[in-house]
Amino acid sequence: MLTVHQPVERVLGVPVHLLDDYVGDLHDRLRRGVGAHVVTLNSEMTMQALESPPGNGSLAEAIASADLVIPDGAGVVFYFWLRGKRVFRCPGIELAERVLQLAGEVGPKWPVFFYGGAPGVAAAASAIWQQRCPGLVFAGMEHGYISPEEEPKLLETLKQLQPRIILVGLGVPRQELWIYRHRHLCPQAIWIGVGGSFDIWAGRKTRAPQWMQQLNMEWAYRLYQEPHRWRRMLALPHFAYLSVVTLRNKPGL
């Protein structure tokens, strides 16, 4: 749940934590054995949350119940810029990489589990990470195309293994809802929805060039790589328009 000691702002009513050190917060949780659901918020996810049916089990509820919601997307940063707040992006893939590096320094005490991606992708990504961080210990991995009949076995595996870091790459909103429903199985784990990060780590896709990242244009590179996403990208201008209109009428929202 959202904790009172962390500064919480709102983006069109959706909560966001504005911290100086997200990695430090998660490092502290890992040391203390305090689990967390981490949401990497961007404008597309914000629009999906606003459009999701209200109530228990919705994307909006999953985000509201998360322990840490970080400003991942350029649209979220743009929203705070309109409000006169200087906020820096915290890309979810970079946050996950830093957490994995911390786990590699500790070793068996903080085992990792990858869930998601096409068959073979999570395994390839884990192999790359074991080369990068020889001290990193994997409790296991599973691709994201298991059948509903196979899911209980996965859940039982997580319950038995109790990994401390669980990265879920099922895409939005599926990964957020899945973590929301099942995080109680591993209460000491850091659960992070990582989208297509496994594909990048496995070498199936690439991140935008550094200059595009610095200009907050990573979304354009993703559209270039995956043109079939163009319908989903329509959420970006909608988000920008709604942000301007909302802040004009309700400056504090």
Residues of each region from the PLM?
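N-terminal nucleotide/polyanion-binding subdomain common to many enzyme families
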Residues: 1-89, 93-94
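A short, gly/pro- and small-residue-rich
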Residues: 53, 57-65, 176-196
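Conserved beta-alpha
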Residues: 77-157, 161-162
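Proline-aspartate-enriched helix->loop->beta-strand connector
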Residues: 158-172
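A transmembrane-helix-recognition feature enriched in membrane-embedded lipid enzymes
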Residues: 77-80, 208-253
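Short glycine-rich anion-binding loops that position phosphate/pyrophosphate groups of nucleotides
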Residues: 42-45, 75-76, 170-175, 197-198
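A short helix->loop->beta-strand "cap" motif at the edges of active sites that frequently abuts
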Residues: 35, 108-109, 186-189
